[in-house]
C-alpha cells in the first residue's frame, strides 16, 4: 500500500506537524555541516572554499510549532559557522576564508515548492546563491552533477537526502553520485521499520525501484 505523505505545505493552510525523530535528524544535519565546514577550512593555508549543498527532499521549510525545516537550518548553520571560522582565523592572525557556497533545494510537490520559496524569502535566504527546483530529485541529478563539475575541480559537495519514500533515492543513484563526484558527502535517511514493511511487498517492482 502506498504511503500518504503527511508533510505537505500549502500557502494559507495549516502547517504540518513535525515529529520528534525529525527534529533529531535536523540536529544531526546541523552538527554534521558545522563539523564538515570546519574540517574543510582547517589549516592556515586555506583561504577559499567552494562547496555545493543539495537538499533533495526539502519540504516547505517550517512546521506548525515554529520549528524550521532543513533549508532554513542549513542556511543558518552555514552562515553561523562561516562567521565563527573567520573570527577564529582573525584572532589567530591567520588569513580569513572566502566562501563560495551554492545551495540547491528540490521539492517535488508544487504547493510545497511554492511555500518553500515564500519561507526562504521571508527569512531573507532567497538570493543568488540559492536555486530552488520543483520536481523529483533523480530528474535533476545529472544537471546538478554537471554544474558541480563545472564550478570547481575539487567537486566538494554534500547531498542531504532525507527521503520520505524508500525508492526516491535508490542505490544506483547513490552509486552514481560517488562515481561522478568522488569527494561528495551523502547524508541518507529513511525509516527502517517502514522500509521493512515496504520490502515485504510481493511485487518484484518494489526491489527493482530501489535498485536491489
Predicted regions and their residues:
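A short acidic (Asp/Glu
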Residues: 63-69, 113-118, 142-145, 168-173, ...
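Short loop/turn segments at strand-loop or loop-helix junctions that form parts
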Residues: 53-61, 108, 188-193
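S-adenosyl-L-methionine
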Residues: 1-80, 96-154
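Surface-exposed acidic, glycine-flexible loop patches that form ligand/cofactor-binding
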Residues: 38-47, 92-97, 149-152
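Short mixed-charge
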Residues: 79-102
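Class I S-adenosyl-L-methionine
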Residues: 3-4, 20, 148-160, 164-212
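Structural motif
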Residues: 52, 102, 156-158
Amino acid at each position: 500500500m502506498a504511503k500518504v505523505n503527511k508533510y505537505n505545505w500549502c500557502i494559507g493552510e495549516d502547517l504540518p506537524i513535525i515529529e520528534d525523530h525529525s527534529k533529531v535528524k535536523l540536529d544531526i544535519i546541523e552538527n554534521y555541516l558545522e563539523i564538515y565546514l570546519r574540517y574543510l577550512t582547517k589549516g592556515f593555508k586555506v583561504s577559499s572554499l567552494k562547496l555545493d549543498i543539495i537538499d533533495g527532499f526539502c519540504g516547505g521549510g517550517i512546521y506548525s510549532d515554529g520549528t524550521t525545516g532543513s533549508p532554513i537550518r542549513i542556511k543558518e548553520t552555514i552562515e553561523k559557522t562561516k562567521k565563527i571560522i573567520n573570527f577564529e582565523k582573525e584572532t589567530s592572525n591567520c588569513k580569513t576564508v572566502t566562501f563560495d557556497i551554492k545551495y540547491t533545494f528540490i521539492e517535488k510537490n508544487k504547493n510545497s515548492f511554492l511555500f518553500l520559496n515564500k519561507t526562504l524569502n521571508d527569512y531573507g535566504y532567497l538570493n543568488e546563491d540559492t536555486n530552488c527546483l520543483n520536481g523529483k530529485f533523480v530528474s535533476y541529478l545529472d544537471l546538478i552533477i554537471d554544474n558541480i563539475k563545472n564550478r570547481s575541480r575539487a567537486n566538494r559537495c554534500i547531498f542531504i537526502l532525507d527521503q520520505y519514500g524508500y525508492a526516491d533515492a535508490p542505490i544506483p543513484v547513490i552509486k552514481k553520485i560517488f562515481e561522478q563526484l568522488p569527494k561528495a558527502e551523502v547524508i541518507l535517511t529513511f525509516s527502517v521499520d517502514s522500509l521493512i514493511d515496504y520490502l515485504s511487498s510481493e511485487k518484484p517492482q518494489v526491489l527493482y525501484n530501489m535498485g536491489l
